[in-house]
Amino acid sequence: MPGTHLEMDLRALDVFACPECGAELRVARREEGGSQNGKIKEGQLRCTQCPATFPILRSMPRFVSSDEYAASFGYQWNRFDKLQLDKFMRNDLSRERFYATTGWPEHLEGQRVLEAGCGMGRFTQIALETGAEVFSFDLSSAIEANFKNNTDAAKVHIFQASIYKIPLRREAFDKIFCMGVLQHCPDVKQAFMSLIPFLRRGGEIAVDVYQRHEGVPPLKYWARPFARRMQPQTLHAVLRWTIPPLFEMKKALYKIPVAGEAIADLIPIGPLSHKPKLDFTDEELKEVKILSALDMLSPAHDHPQRIEDVRAWFEEAGLEGIQIKLGFNGINAKGKKPISPPEHHSRPNH
């Protein structure tokens, strides 16, 4: 299809950099029949300064050799690859969350945006609708689902990389966002700090992260130590075996006068309807609940944060215009990189 993004676009190569040493990358190899019109389906990138090489597989450069701690998300988003897409679920939930978190305008033509942790591309889609050029990465194989969901966009560049070793040129982005990701990183603060060097002066960054609550932890934190011992495939099978009948049981209990509703509320699968805001069928809602449970129980890391700590990160990063609030997903925070670098005052000689 003319104008579609089906291969790695070599015009974006000057934005990439070696994650090991920061030097430029060059195309070292192209598979026979694997490139056309300045785009590559299969091949290899090589650093111009150090021995590092990186494969291009199925049109996407890969800067990690495995999913590491994010393997559960790779499994999750390749199986639920449409369930949170606004256009598929007939709602604007992702759009609402994106704009509530970022506060950005709906038109970003001429700007370059970085998405850190893309999953299957629910927010990639919204960012692309602004007209911006979007670079989107994930540690996990969820990039395969994102690629499938957004291949009709001409200005998207999807790649697999670690948030701790981002393979891009510094100060190359007008805007950076990271949503639904930070709490699942081993070192949450360092994951946030790793994004700052890639933001241009005057550029904006917006993130969200789970909020830490004092007192008795939510139910999922009691279940996670047991659930995490299972492979994602096994946990998914258990949830698919248990949640649909629990849904039907809860639905039946609500019809029983007096005590039925109180008993039904003890079944920990959330509400049976989100109407009028979200008009799911029962079958769709069962799938949503299976996905939600898998998302809560399977990640290797889940580290909620305190508002004061998030504010301290933004201040330590030297950002200005800091705004922090509670919203979608917990803590929403944004800030701007100063146009002028900070002044360094040297000590007078005596």
Regions found by a protein language model. Give the residues of each.
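A short SAM/SAH-binding and catalytic strip from SAM-dependent methyltransferases
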Residues: D174-D187
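Extended, charge-rich helix/loop segments that form flexible
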Residues: P232-V288
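Conserved N-terminal segment of class I S-adenosyl-L-methionine
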Residues: P2-R169, K175, H301-H303, D309, ...
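Conserved, well-ordered alpha-helix/loop/beta-strand core segments that scaffold catalytic motifs
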Residues: W313-F314, L319
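Short, glycine-/aromatic-enriched active-site segment of Class I SAM-dependent methyltransferases
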Residues: Y210-A227, D282-A300
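A short glycine-rich, Lys/Arg-flanked "PGG" loop and its adjoining helix->strand segment in the class I
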Residues: K189-R201
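Conserved class I S-adenosyl-L-methionine
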Residues: E204-A237, W241-P244, E248
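Glycine-rich, histidine-containing beta strand-loop boundary motifs that form or position
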Residues: D138, Q160, G180, V209-Q211
